[in-house]
UniProtKB/Swiss-Prot annotation:
The active site is at H707 (proton acceptor). It holds the Pfam family GMC_oxred_N. It is an enzyme of class 1 (oxidoreductase). Keywords: Carbohydrate metabolism, Cellulose degradation, FAD, Flavoprotein, Heme, Iron, Metal-binding, Oxidoreductase, Polysaccharide degradation, Pyrrolidone carboxylic acid, Secreted, Signal. The gene is CDH-1. In the C-terminal section; belongs to the GMC oxidoreductase family. Gene3D superfamilies: Cellobiose dehydrogenase, cytochrome domain, Cholesterol Oxidase, domain 2, FAD/NAD(P)-binding domain. This is Cellobiose dehydrogenase. The keyword Coiled coil does not apply. Its cofactor is FAD; heme. It comes from Phanerodontia chrysosporium (White-rot fungus). The lineage of its organism: Eukaryota, Fungi, Dikarya, Basidiomycota, Agaricomycotina.
Length: 773
């Protein structure tokens, strides 16, 4: 009988397959519950509560239902969504009766009998037959626990279930021991809509005329924070990573009225975010290393570089703003080619102009960042502009015509505002923070998304104050957005059972991370980390008698030139209002394979290193860095190692021989007329080494520009891409990515401008996609 009853029940609970609770009616009893059916094990969980009290305390009881196949040897429910410090209900079939108990655990050990006041009563509607067992029960004293924790029946929360196909040790004993569950999962529930005016009728065995009340009390609480157990607050959108993609998405989604949680694994950066890492000479201002543009080069020489991610083997920023808080801040509005279908963007993305316009209106670029409108330390610009004019280049204000990228040079452009580093932190994040529906948490690391098949239930964090054991759920139609950067997002996907099998198996070999993996039959095979790109870059070092190398930036943190420091502190003007880059240039090259490649150059006083047999004046050195960008064909692979550190598995630099040929041609062209500039000498490489020999000997690690894209690329097929045209991860219902990993091909300039325009467009597409909150 129960088997047919369950089949009749399935149409009513079909909506619950998304693993966010919805209402259904048991066709045998007529009782109306709120719950889910787990599609993997075909177990139904339902709950109904007494009517909400209009005054005074709420009732602490409910009626629950579990319908499970006979193969389910025991079922567990964690009322707070976690095993530890959470009221647990355990039940199994023993012959013609259901055996049940309330349990408690303070660690990942065998739960023991709960010593509180909760009372379980099996109701007469309980049935067992040859295929299924149904347990209908009353749980009194079950929403408030003796340790001070509980669930808030007026708000939203999360429940966890446990399933085992291994029988308990003594089925006749309610306190029997048993082996660890063979599977578990979570689901979100809106308790405020799970109350029924017919609750007393249900206790009397009468369904009455089932109606539910969805009226909320005038005052609600979203979480219970007393005691060691915390009930999680669900969000419409949980965004992982406060880099440029995450911040822009958070601002636009909260602007649309969505309840948004933004999580950042690192801490504050700029003064505005609560940062306090201030140079000794700048203490009166409170402006940090991340505020003052002229301190950029000191990021790489500091003895305590806490801002770099310690579990990623390349430079990656783990702080508010991500890479935009620690990069050189070069900022180029994308050109039409950067969003072309020819480089991999879906046709629906090619009209980037409205989104780039939204970006530039919020965050305009400047090529004269000093507040007095003057440019400083421009000697290298003057020298190289002469060199480039001799090669047929024209000078322009680069961002006035983003499509002009051949034989053009101009002053370096930045996303600084008022003489300080700005980017999305000073703009988009600030408007988001002003909204009551936006929550921002720092120093919270997300290890994985928690999912049941294709449905993401929430995220697992290291912060137990935000949810049971750190789990934070999304609302029934909620979504998760990963914006943790190319390496961070890839690792989260691997640890969530999404990606190439070898990467998930690497997670499986880690005893800590393996416990959070979904069952192998729920792994999603996608090319995460494949096809990664980064600009190969080569440094050429020169001297010229007019150059001021600015002590190679060595003294800017502890002992700057007094006049420059004083000028900056007075009104954010002068040398310290700008970063080290002074000039940028581009040139297009036709490769022998038919692809047009673009070379970009960046000029700055000083040098990261000098390797020369020639005598030289260190106070007169400057660097031209030459990159290859759009059109490059080389790709590599990023992933994780056995310690789960993000790392480069297959280097992507100059794998394609034509890429190398074009880069060498660009290097030769840059120095082709060096003799026409009196006093200009190239010292790295010097006369003892050809450019070919120099490139062949170049350390690949220093060829890395940290402009990683395409690791979770956008596309039309899960065989070749990770996200679809709505930036939704293939094989999932509600997981999205908004960071540089979705960019299918290197843009013509430094990628942060393209990324931020893409984030504007991604946020719009996510909001427009049906089925969301």
């Amino acid at each position: 009988m129960l088997g047919r009853s369950l089949l009749a029940l399935l149409p009513f609970v079909g909506l619950a397959f998304s693993q966010s609770a919805s209402q259904f009616t048991d066709p045998t009893t007529g009782f109306q519950f709120t719950g889910i059916t787990d599609p993997v094990h075909d177990v139904t969980y339902g709950f109904v509560f007494p009517p909400l009290a209009t005054s005074g305390a709420q009732s602490t009881e409910f009626i629950g239902e579990v319908v499970a196949p006979i193969a389910s040897k025991w079922i567990g429910i964690a009322l707070g969504g976690a095993m530890n410090n959470d009221l647990l209900l355990v039940a199994w079939a023993n012959g013609n009766q259901i055996v049940s108990s309330t349990r408690w655990a303070t660690g990942y050990v065998q739960p023991t009998a709960y010593t509180g006041t909760a009372t379980l009563t099996t109701l007469p509607e309980t049935t067992i037959n040859s295929t299924h067992w149904k347990w209908v029960f009353r749980c009194q004293g079950c929403t408030e626990w003796n340790n001070g924790g509980g669930i808030d029946v007026t708000s939203q929360g999360v429940l966890a279930w446990a399933f085992s196909n291994v029988a308990v040790d003594d089925p006749s004993d309610p306190q029997s021991t048993f082996s660890e569950h063979t599977d578990f999962g979570f689901f979100g529930i809106d308790y405020s809509t799970a109350h029924s005016a017919n609750y007393q009728n249900y206790l009397n065995g009468d369904s009455g005329n089932p109606t539910t009340t969805s009226t909320k009390p005038t005052s609600t609480s979203s979480s219970v924070t007393t005691g060691p157990t915390v009930s999680a607050t669900p969000y419409d959108y949980i965004i992982v990573g406060a880099g440029p993609g995450g911040i822009i998405a958070a601002d636009r989604l909260s602007e649309a009225g969505k309840k948004v949680l933004l999580l950042e694994r690192g801490g504050p950066s700029t003064k505005q975010t609560g940062g306090t890492y201030v140079a000794p000479w700048a203490t009166s201002s409170g402006l940090t290393k991340f505020d003052i543009p002229g301190l950029f080069e000191s990021l790489f020489t500091d003895s305590n570089p806490f801002w770099w991610c310690k579990d990623i083997t390349v430079f990656a920023g783990c702080l508010v703003g991500g890479g935009t808080s620690v990069n050189g801040a070069l900022y180029w509005y994308p050109n039409d080619g950067d969003f072309s279908s020819s480089v991999g963007w879906p046709s629906s993305w090619t009209n980037h102009a409205p989104y780039t316009s939204k970006l530039s209106s919020r965050l305009p670029s400047t090529d004269h960042p000093s507040t007095d409108g003057q440019r400083y330390l421009e000697q290298s610009f003057n020298v190289v502009s002469q060199l480039l004019k001799g090669q047929g280049y024209n000078q322009a204000t680069i961002n006035d015509n983003p499509n002009y990228k051949d034989h053009v040079f101009g002053y370096s452009a930045f996303d600084f505002l008022n003489g300080k580093r700005a980017g999305p932190v000073a703009t988009y994040l600030q408007t988001a923070l002003a909204r009551p529906n936006f929550t921002f948490k720092t120093n919270v690391m997300v290890s994985n998304v928690v999912r049941n098949g294709s449905q993401i239930l929430g995220v697992q964090t290291n912060d137990p104050t935000l949810g049971p054991n750190g789990f934070i759920p999304v609302t029934p139609k909620g979504r998760v957005i990963l914006s943790a950067g190319a390496f961070g997002t890839s690792r989260i996907l691997f640890q969530s059972g999404i990606g190439p099998t070898d990467m998930i198996q690497t997670v499986q070999s880690n005893p800590t991370a393996a416990a959070a993996l979904p069952p192998q039959n729920q792994w999603i095979n996608l090319p995460v980390g494949m096809n990664a790109q980064d600009n190969p870059s080569i440094n050429l070092v020169f001297t010229h008698p007019s150059i001021d190398a600015y002590e190679n930036w060595a003294d800017v943190w502890s002992n700057p030139r007094p006049a420059d420091a004083a000028q900056y502190l007075a009104n954010q003007s002068g040398v310290f209002a700008g970063a080290s880059p002074k000039l940028n240039f581009w040139r297009a090259y036709s490769g022998s394979d038919g692809f047009t490649r673009y070379a970009q150059g960046t000029v700055r006083p000083g040098a990261a290193s000098v390797n020369s047999s020639l005598p030289y004046n260190a106070s007169q050195i400057f660097t031209i860095t030459v990159y290859l960008s759009t059109g490059i064909q080389s790709r590599g692979r990023i992933g994780i190692d056995a310690a789960l550190r993000g790392t480069v598995l297959t280097p992507p630099w100059l794998v394609n021989p034509v890429d190398k040929t074009v880069l060498l041609q660009a290097l030769h062209d840059v120095v082709s007329n060096i003799g026409s500039i009196p006093g200009l000498t190239m010292i790295t490489p010097d006369v003892t080494q050809t450019l070919e020999e120099y490139v062949d000997a170049y350390d690949p690690a220093t060829m890395n520009s940290n402009h990683w894209v395409s690791s979770t690329t956008i596309g039309s097929s899960p065989q070749s891409a990770v996200v679809d045209s709505n930036v939704k991860v293939f094989g999932t219902n509600n997981l999205f990515i908004v960071d540089a990993g979705i960019i299918p091909h290197l843009p013509t300039g430094n990628p942060q401008g393209t990324l931020m325009s893409a984030a504007e467009q991604a946020a719009a597409k996510i909001l427009a996609l049906a089925g969301g909150p």
